[in-house]
């Protein structure tokens, strides 16, 4: 969220190059963070599960579930960076749409569909999360590519018109 005022300021000032630059930096930071967190969960799931339970069987079950549930966490930084940038450039509705897409439009149906496709019904429910995350990131990238280019093109045109005035 620290990038939001910087991106918003530069967008408001008409500085498209700085908006692009702040998005690239935000994307790098978010991806590094999500990949790091994903790696920690994949390498040490018992550590995380053990924070909430002490029973060995429960910790083992939760550790396995965490690995499945967080399977696509490494790509989530992309969605976070795009959502923050949408808000920063005045496209809050786009941010809401991709959030709703991930948790309601994709996840809820996948929770019901995945157990029909996989033999292990419990794992299938957990697998709905990374499936929804993966599809949501693809949707977010497509939506972001279109709207970010449109917003920056409009900004650059306004700057040209102001320069000619």
Residue ranges and their predicted role:
Residues 1-45, 76-95:
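Small-residue-rich hydrophobic transmembrane alpha-helices
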Residues 2, 38-39, 74-81, 100-108, ...:
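Hydrophobic alpha-helical transmembrane bundles that constitute the permease/transmembrane domains
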Residues 30, 66-69, 73, 99-100, ...:
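Residue-level recognition of transmembrane alpha-helices
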Residues 36-59, 63:
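Short membrane-interface helical motifs at transmembrane helix boundaries
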Residues 41, 84, 110-111, 115, ...:
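Structural signal for membrane-spanning alpha-helices in multi-pass inner-membrane proteins
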Residues 45, 104-138, 152:
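Membrane-interface helix-loop junctions in multi-pass transport and translocation proteins
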Residues 56-82, 109:
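Alpha-helical transmembrane segments of multi-pass membrane proteins
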Residues 150-165:
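Intrinsic disorder in cytosolic terminal tails and internal cytosolic loops
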